[in-house]
Each structure stands twice: as structure tokens, then as C-alpha cells.
């Protein structure tokens, strides 16, 4: 089978990491994969290192976040060119399936699939919160009769009425850590951290406000923020400046972006996921489970689908810095409960969120989507 794979970014966000997780399994089946992405970010050399031919594609000068009326007009003006380009790529690669890894290219890909008679699989990695965006994606799914995979029920909900029986839920996965995490001794400096893209919806500011409330009462500790802005986020520099202001006088380490998350997680006593507008079920929680790191999180988006409160992790309500500080203090005071949650999270990862399970389910979904053609 020949697969044409389309992504709207070439940075390495969660959706792109999922793609890299899947590619070896597709190639092991003997399927030929050709990809097209905009730009020349780290996704491009990563895919080429796996033997994937990568073409460049334009999908418009749109920035991360909510789209404006002018964005919609630019999209409409560029649509014929986008769609024709995808159709040419599909014909040139003799594609048996068009795999769309994000919503921005979905309308053009759906039109190209319909025109060329090819099946299409849309992988939905985050909830389309804007009504216009979910309507446009839904109409595209209907136009092409597309198969859809969503990473959680929360992400799937706006599309369910359009996709119907053509929708599957396949949760993300975490790889096996390269080595077992060494126990953190009682004399080790306490480390509490956030890992992920730097953005207001990810809650680093809430974490730092909670840290300021916590710092006077905790034993010596470090607060860790690992990550950076991605996807040409227009507000990134302003938000980064706010974070440094909030961190002033606190024992905070800003680690920047790390390609490998395991060395960071292995040094944490507690992972905090303070997302205030989480669009899916963040994969860093699954990575923490794999690494036996306990988790405290706001119950945002699809997070409650992967965290069993009080068993595999601890959910915080209301989603405020004060409540977060109180929850962190509470769980740190109960080390036995914390260790129990870390073990239960690891067991849940083994049962539901391994890379092998993800690849198996996704390969089956790709085969299912291709048979629909």
C-alpha cells in the first residue's frame, strides 16, 4: 500500500511525535509512505531518517490559536491551490490512502480525495473548539466519507455527528523508558515540574503562582519548567516574559525544549499538568506513568479519561493556583499514597498505553480506512 501523509506543521509537537511513533510500524508492514509538510522543522529530518520521502507543501500563513475572519478569507482564496497540490501529490505517489495528521489540510485533502477517488484517514489530535472549525472539518469528513481516528473522547465529540460509524478512539502511547528510574532518596532535593509546550493554555503561569504559595512551606526544592513555544505562536514571547516575572525569587529551572523527555522525568518527584484549556489527553501524563512519576493535574479536556483520580494520579478542582498548591502540599505529605499512585499509573500504562498497543491499533485503523476506498 502507498500512503500519502500530510501534516500542517514541521515542528515536533505531540501530534508529530505520535506520527513518528507510528511510522516504523507502517514501514514494517511493507507500506510505502510519502509525506508532505510545510517548512523545514525537525519533523522533516526525523522522517527522512526513517526512509520517508518528504515533500514541501504550503498550507497558508496561519498562526496557532483561534482563526480570524481574515484567516478564513485567506484560506478560501488559497483553497483551490492547496487542493490541486494535494491531488498532484496523491497522483504522483500513486497513493492508496491519504493520511491527514491535522485539521488545517483536511478540507483540501478531502476535496482531493473525492476528486481522485481515494480513501482518506483523518487523525484528530485535539478538540476543534471553534464552531466554524468543527463544522468545516465535519463537512470535509462527510464530503470524502473519511475514516477518523481521535486521540480521546473529548477530541472526538465535535466530530461524532459527522463521522458516525467511521470514527474510532485510539489513545496515544508512551515508549518504554530507556532505563528504569532510580529511586529518589529521602535526602534528594525535591523536584516538581511541568513538561510541555510553553503556552497560556498549558498552565505554566498557574504552576508558578502555585509555586510561590508553596515555596515557604516546602523543604528545599526546585520547580522545573521544561518546554518551549512551538508552531509560530504569536504570543509566545509575551507569555515567556510573564513566566520569568512570576519566577523571580523562586527556585525555578527553565530547561527549554528537550527532544528526549526521559532524563527530565526521571529527575522529578512529581509531574504537574496544570492545563487550563487542554484540547486532548496530553501524552506527557502517559510518559510519566511509564517512568513511574506521580501526576497532579487539572481535570481539563481529555485528562480525566487517562487519570483515575486518587488512584493513578490526583486531579485538582477548582483549576486555580491556590487549589493546585494545596493539592501538591497534600500529596507530598503522603509519600506512601504518592508511591502507590506512581505504581498504579505504571500498571495502567502497561495495560492501555504502550507503544505496541498504539501501533497495533493504528495499523488496523489504517488498513480499515484503506479498505473503505
Where would I find each of the regions flagged by the language model?
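A conserved mid-protein helix/loop that constitutes part of the nucleotide-sugar donor-binding site
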Residues: 13-21, 199-213, 286, 322
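Short His-centered aromatic/hydrophobic patch
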Residues: 100-106, 124
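A short, well-ordered alpha-helix in the C-terminal region of glycosyltransferases
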Residues: 323, 330, 337-352, 358
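Conserved acidic donor-binding segment of nucleotide-sugar-dependent glycosyltransferases
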Residues: 309-310, 314-321, 330-336
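Carbohydrate-associated surface elements
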Residues: 154, 173
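Acidic donor-binding loop of glycosyltransferase active sites
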Residues: 266-280, 293-294
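Nucleotide-activated donor-binding/catalytic signature segment of Leloir-type glycosyltransferases, i.e.
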Residues: 237-257
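Short hydrophobic beta-strand element within catalytic cores of glycosyltransferases
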Residues: 294-297, 307
Amino acid at each position: 500500500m502507498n500512503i500519502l501523509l500530510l501534516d500542517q506543521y514541521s515542528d515536533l509537537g505531540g501530534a508529530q511525535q505520535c506520527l513518528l511513533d507510528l511510522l516504523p510500524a507502517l514501514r514494517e508492514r511493507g507500506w510505502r509512505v510519502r509525506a508532505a509538510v510545510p517548512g523545514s522543522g525537525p519533523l522533516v529530518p526525523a522522517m527522512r531518517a526513517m526512509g520517508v520521502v518528504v515533500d514541501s507543501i504550503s498550507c497558508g500563513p496561519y498562526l496557532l490559536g483561534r482563526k480570524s475572519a481574515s484567516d478564513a478569507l485567506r484560506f478560501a482564496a488559497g483553497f483551490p491551490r492547496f487542493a490541486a497540490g494535494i491531488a498532484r501529490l496523491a497522483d504522483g505517489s500513486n497513493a492508496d490512502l491519504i493520511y491527514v495528521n491535522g485539521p488545517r489540510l483536511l478540507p483540501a485533502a478531502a476535496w482531493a480525495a473525492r476528486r481522485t477517488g481515494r480513501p482518506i484517514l483523518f487523525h484528530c489530535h485535539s478538540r476543534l473548539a471553534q464552531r466554524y472549525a468543527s463544522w468545516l472539518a465535519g463537512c470535509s469528513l462527510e464530503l470524502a466519507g473519511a475514516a477518523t481516528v481521535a486521540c480521546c473522547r473529548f477530541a472526538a465529540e465535535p466530530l461524532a455527528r459527522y463521522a458516525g460509524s467511521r470514527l474510532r478512539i485510539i489513545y496515544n502511547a508512551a515508549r518504554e523508558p530507556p532505563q528504569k528510574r532510580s529511586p529518589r532518596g529521602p535526602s534528594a532535593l525535591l523536584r516538581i515540574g511541568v513538561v510541555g509546550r510553553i503556552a497560556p493554555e498549558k498552565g505554566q503561569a498557574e504552576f508558578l503562582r502555585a509555586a510561590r504559595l508553596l515555596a515557604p512551606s516546602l523543604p528545599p526544592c526546585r520547580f522545573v519548567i521544561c518546554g518551549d513555544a512551538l508552531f509560530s505562536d504569536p504570543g509566545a514571547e509575551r507569555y515567556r516574559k510573564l513566566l520569568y516575572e512570576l519566577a523571580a525569587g523562586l527556585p525555578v529551572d527553565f530547561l527549554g525544549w528537550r527532544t528526549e523527555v526521559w532524563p527530565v522525568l526521571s529527575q522529578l518527584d512529581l509531574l504537574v499538568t496544570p492545563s487550563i484549556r487542554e484540547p486532548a489527553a496530553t501524552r506527557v501524563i502517559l510518559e510519566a506513568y511509564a517512568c513511574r512519576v506521580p501526576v497532579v493535574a487539572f481535570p481539563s479536556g481529555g485528562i480525566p479519561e487517562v487519570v483515575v483520580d486518587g488512584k493513578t494520579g490526583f486531579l485538582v478542582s477548582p483549576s486555580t493556583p491556590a487549589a493546585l498548591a494545596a493539592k501538591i502540599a497534600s500529596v507530598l505529605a503522603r509519600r506512601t499514597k504518592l508511591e502507590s499512585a506512581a505504581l498504579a499509573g505504571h500498571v495502567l500504562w502497561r495495560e492501555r498505553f504502550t507503544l505496541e498497543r498504539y501501533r497495533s491499533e493504528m495499523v488496523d485503523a489504517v488498513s480499515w480506512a484503506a479498505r473503505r476506498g
